[in-house]
Amino acid sequence: MKLYEYLVEGTKHFTLIDPDKSVDYLKIAKYALEAGTDGILVGGSLGIRESQITQVVKDIKSIAHVPVVIFPGSISQLTDEADGVLFLSVLNSLDPYYIIGAQIQGAVLLAKHYPKLEVISTAYIIIGDGGAAGFVSMSKPIPYTRPDIVMAYALAANYIGFKAVYLEAGSGAPQPAPPEMVRAARRVFPRILIVGGGIRSGEVAYTIAREKPNVIVTGTLAEEKPEKLGEIIRAIKSA
């Protein structure tokens, strides 16, 4: 099955592993797999080389029975060991480099050196706190209180033709995207909708899952309290 077809069906849980933060990335991956995660995202906003991400993906693939997908923080974070890559465009960045500049460079690299890697074009929309991703990409995060603005961005992403929209509250965010914000994006975007950042409990995961995103991502929780992953995943599956 193609990665796109896998992602667009139902609501899944993905675990984000940032090798720059997690020395014990295999331990986190094992926890996540045992808890029932549906996939692994690998990447981060800072300090990851191509050789590093290649080794991390190879190691995780050796134990994983689910897709392992690159979540790149820069054009150096690519490897053909993965099942696919989220080809991110930060729609609300104030710097054109993060909207289209890096994508031009990355597209050439993908075509020349990673032709077998499945590419999922992804409109990356920073909300709320934004975290490191918002800071590094020089974004103007959308306030939690403005689902109407998120809807406008998601509608634009739909008309442009992105395969996915990713609502990102940021790593370790104080709160996740509120349900009404997820609902607003879902109303106008018919393909893959991803929500991540600030999800720390089964109750919160359940309220988000009820809005029918395709993927709910947890990262900081997996690093700090991996034993809670089971609670999150069960809540998503029960929604």
Swiss-Prot record:
InterPro entries recorded: GGGP/HepGP_synthase_I, GGGP/HepGP_synthase_sf, GGGP_HepGP_synthase, GGGP_synth
GO biological process: glycerophospholipid biosynthetic process
Molecular function GO terms recorded: magnesium ion binding; phosphoglycerol geranylgeranyltransferase activity
Binding residues annotated for sn-glycerol 1-phosphate, in chain numbering: 166-172, 197-198, 219-220
Pathway entry: Membrane lipid metabolism; glycerophospholipid metabolism
Cofactors required: Mg(2+)
Main EC class the enzyme belongs to: transferase
Disulfide bridge map: none
Localization terms from the record: Cytoplasm
Protein keywords: Cytoplasm, Lipid biosynthesis, Lipid metabolism, Magnesium, Metal-binding, Phospholipid biosynthesis, Phospholipid metabolism, Transferase
Protein name: Geranylgeranylglyceryl phosphate synthase
Phylogenetic lineage: Archaea, Thermoproteota, Thermoprotei, Thermoproteales, Thermoproteaceae
